[in-house]
Amino acid sequence: MKKYIILAFTAMLPLAAAAQQEEEATENGIVSVDGTKGFTITSKKGDFVFKPYALIQTTANFNYYDDEGLDKAYNQDNVANTGFAIPYAVLGFTGKAFGRVTFNLTMNAAASGGNLLQQAWFDVKLKEQFAIKVGKFKTPFTHAYLTTLGETLLPQVPTSLTATTIMPHTLNAVTPAIGTGFDLGVEIHGLLAKKFGYEVGIFNGTGASVNTATKTFSDDWHIPSLLYSARLTWMPKGVMPSTQGNPNRLHEDKMLFGLSVSENVESESESTNDFRAGFEFSMLKDRWYVGAEAYYMHVGFTKRQKIDDTFNYWGAYAQAGYFVTNQLQLAARYDFMDRNSTGKDGLLNMPAVGVNYFFPNTNLKLQAMYQYIGRTGHATQLDRDNDDLGQPMHTAKVLLQYTF
């Protein structure tokens, strides 16, 4: 049944609806580059725009891991993945050509392999209601990922989106996370009546680290083994800026409600078919920012795996930020995840607090956060120990960011 739904979904691409981020000539998803930042080369008519930009982040990290039930005789290190890091050293340029084609190319020097090319896309806007975007860019799923990278409330996205899921099968290749992030593909999108946005896309489904065509046809469904994704939003007060805190936007009154779905056909080394769905809410009201999301993932194995089990996972979070002064923003988040599937008892609950300081007239931003990962409702101590494997119980992070 699912394969017919996906085929119908693909055939109806021009008619589908899903969420839209604010479209500007300098939109890039990394930093806000409005006319007050950096410099821009513009033609006299304004139909050609070229704008370079940069984002540099340096972090100091402390992570404390639970013993996970191991005896002290193993002499395991509780403190790991601690020290300094550069998660992003981004250099890119964005712009507009012929008055209707926007483009963006971004390299992340802090990454390796295929992740070096963070983004590379062009977007042909035929009219406000219809545009075509091609290349490597953010997939239309979750407010947390679609927020401008340099304007997130906390220096890491919710763990419920990034943590790999747990299932009782020894298939090392099958460790899907709920979040999808960057990918290669094509999407159509537009804005209807200044309030309704849509994005519908087809992607490789292999993530940001792969820049080549590696997919095949599904043996079970006989359709291309790709990621089919769509997102629909309603913005009752006009287009919602893709920010979770910007000192230049302290008088906004915007709101967004969104729904998204996707199916990754023969993902995880052709082992599974992964269905995802999500609901999101975000709001900017003067000095307040509020965001909340809930998402679900269904994992079913391909016939070649000869595994009849299916697994369902979900996660959710709510977060808020408030500018106490024009430069100081306080932040809090509560994150939940059913990491070991709905078939087993137990949840991860992850409260976090943070503070952000924006240095005036410098484009410098200082962020600090603390997160605790708790475990509740597990049937056995072994389940409790396994549920947060690879995840730190205590996380403290300080991030200094410069944008240009």
Where are the regions a protein language model picked out?
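N-terminal periplasmic/intermembrane-space "pro-region" immediately following the signal or transit peptide
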Residues: 4-11, 15-57, 193-195, 404
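Outer membrane beta-barrel
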Residues: 39-65, 69-208, 224-239, 319-331, ...
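Gram-negative outer-membrane beta-barrel proteins
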Residues: 60-66, 111-115, 140-144, 206-210, ...
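Transmembrane beta-barrel architecture of outer membranes
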Residues: 88, 117-119, 183-185, 225-229, ...
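Outer-membrane beta-barrel "beta-signal"
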Residues: 227-239, 359, 364, 388-404
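Detector for outer-membrane/organellar transmembrane beta-barrel domains
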Residues: 231-340
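Outer membrane beta-barrel transmembrane domains
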Residues: 319-321, 325-375
